Amino acid sequence: MRAQPPPRTLLSLALALLFLSMSWAKRGCSSSSPKLLSQLKSQANITGNTASLLEPYILHQNLNTLTLRAACTEHPVAFPSEDMLRQLSKPDFLSTVHATLGRVWHQLGAFRQQFPKIQDFPELERARQNIQGIRNNVYCMARLLHPPLEIPEPTQADSGTSRPTTTAPGIFQIKIDSCRFLWGYHRFMGSVGRVFEEWGDGSRRSRRHSPLWAWLKGDHRIRPSRSSQSAMLRSLVPR
């Protein structure tokens, strides 16, 4: 019996397949909003999984104890809440996601300083590539809105190294702060995925129940009353 690959390997393969279209996004945007929405939902749900980045970070930095895990998850770095995201219009939601992921992309670039050999933590660079792919799709989805969303075309930004500060925290505190940031990032992406799910459900529901949709579908359940029919006929009879 052949051994099954570990979960992390399966997740890495899934991520590689899902974000394979990243290089194509730079060549042009898809004109299919359902296709883009499907990709965005999948991307958000997968990156919302802590196994894609937080869990490898915890293991790599020796934070895998109940106390240290609690320190990571009890005080996450603040990201836009799910309630706030639900209240935004579609253009504002896309703009918020695009800007927030830009901040995450730069912050993950600063994480490089924690790893003398970046190949020791390949999940970090993979996560940054995935974020760039999501931002590309957000940009493409924004182009399909009417009026289109004004966000800059995605480009390869700088290396993302952080500027030196006057009071540098200790190594252990840097690890805890980074862990909190990653936990907040995963929670944010989970919220983004759930909002995108509602986009699909809400658009179909509102379209089916709209008066215009009923008229286009020839809904004959709503008929004028007999009195209104008689009045209309009398108005058509020449006098």
Swiss-Prot record:
Annotated organism of origin: Rattus norvegicus
PTM annotation? Propeptide processing is not important for receptor binding activity but may be important growth-inhibitory activity.
Q: Name the predominant localization.
A: secreted
Which SUPFAM superfamilies does this UniProt record tie to the protein? 4-helical cytokines
> InterPro entries from the xrefs?
4_helix_cytokine-like_core, Leukemia_IF/oncostatin, Leukemia_IF/oncostatin_CS, OSM
> What is one GO biological process annotated to this record?
positive regulation of inflammatory response
Q: In which tissues is it expressed?
A: Widely expressed. Expressed at higher levels in liver, skin and spleen.
The similarity annotation says: Belongs to the LIF/OSM family.
Name of the protein in its database record: Oncostatin-M
Q: Listed GO cellular component terms?
A: extracellular space
